[in-house]
Swiss-Prot record:
Segments traversing the membrane: 123-143, 177-197
Assigned protein family: Belongs to the TMEM74 family.
Membrane topology: Multi-pass membrane protein
Keyword entries, A-Z: Membrane, Transmembrane, Transmembrane helix
Region Disordered, residue ranges: 1-111
Organism the protein comes from: Homo sapiens (Human)
Protein name: Transmembrane protein 74B
Gene behind this protein: TMEM74B
Compositional bias per record (Low complexity), positions renumbered to this chain: 80-96
Length: 256
């Protein structure tokens, strides 16, 4: 019993194809029936010099890829946003996951890129002023201002020298107290100003978020939602916009 045989259609060269590049538009090639068997096979023809497409099982039309390539170049306006023209043979140049990532990055834009937050130097300065003022005041009040010695055990000249020393020390401590109070005042004022500015910014941001812009929209996953003004009651509603499918070209090729 002869082995099971399959049939494959391959493109046969016409008389114009043998003449070389003098005929740019060759006649549509015919279809030739070729037998595939497990037994001794007939000698094959010499392989052409150009790139050869990989063999596939079933019926294969050799002129399909070339016609599709010409159609892509003749109709460039039919390609939609987010879909790239596929190379001959319907093989995509990038995997599907990478194309989806590129489309999401193009939709989101550079607004969602991670931005490093600057250090709040005003808040840090206010804290430094407050801590410095507290330390100065506490230190000035912790140091004694009078000599704690028995005047009977010390001579008059030594007692006078100690009094002069503590008088100068008291003046320096008073200056430290004044400086500490000044630092506390400056730190408190700066902290209050920063608090007021932050409250004003938060209020402005809250008003800005509640009032929808002209082209405001938000992206959730693969669905774009935007606000649209209704004609009747003047309210607002979320409208769903379909995202352009990146793999639409591949589905079209599979259906054809």
């Amino acid at each position: 019993m002869p082995p099971a045989q399959g049939y494959e259609f391959a493109a046969a060269k016409g008389p114009r194809d043998e003449l070389g590049p003098s005929f740019p538009m060759a006649s549509p090639p015919g279809l030739e029936l070729k037998t595939l068997s497990n037994g001794p096979q007939a000698p094959r023809r010499s392989a052409p010099l150009g790139p050869v497409a990989p063999t596939r099982e079933g019926v294969e039309n050799a002129c399909f890829s070339s016609e599709e390539h010409e159609t892509h170049f003749q109709n460039p306006g039919n390609t939609r946003l987010g879909s790239s023209p596929s190379p001959p043979g319907g093989v995509s140049s990038l995997p599907r996951s990478q194309r989806d990532d590129l489309s999401l990055h193009s939709e989101e834009g550079p607004a969602l890129e991670p931005v490093s937050r600057p250090v709040d130097y005003g808040f840090v300065s206010a804290l430094v002023f407050l801590v410095s003022g507290i330390l100065l005041v506490v230190t000035a009040y912790a140091i004694p201002r009078e000599a704690r010695v028995n005047p009977d055990t010390v001579t008059a000249r030594e007692m006078e020298r100690l009094e002069m020393y503590y008088a100068r020390l008291g003046s320096h401590l008073d200056r430290c107290i004044i400086a500490g109070l000044g630092l506390l005042t400056v730190g408190g004022m700066l902290l209050s100003v920063l608090l007021m500015v932050s409250l004003c910014k938060g209020e402005l941001y809250r008003r800005r978020t509640f009032v929808p812009g002209k082209g405001s929209r938000k992206t959730y996953g693969s669905i774009n939602l935007r606000m649209r003004q209704l004609n009747g009651d003047g309210g607002q509603a979320l409208v769903e916009n379909e995202v352009v499918q990146v793999s639409e070209t591949s589905h079209t090729l599979q259906r054809s």
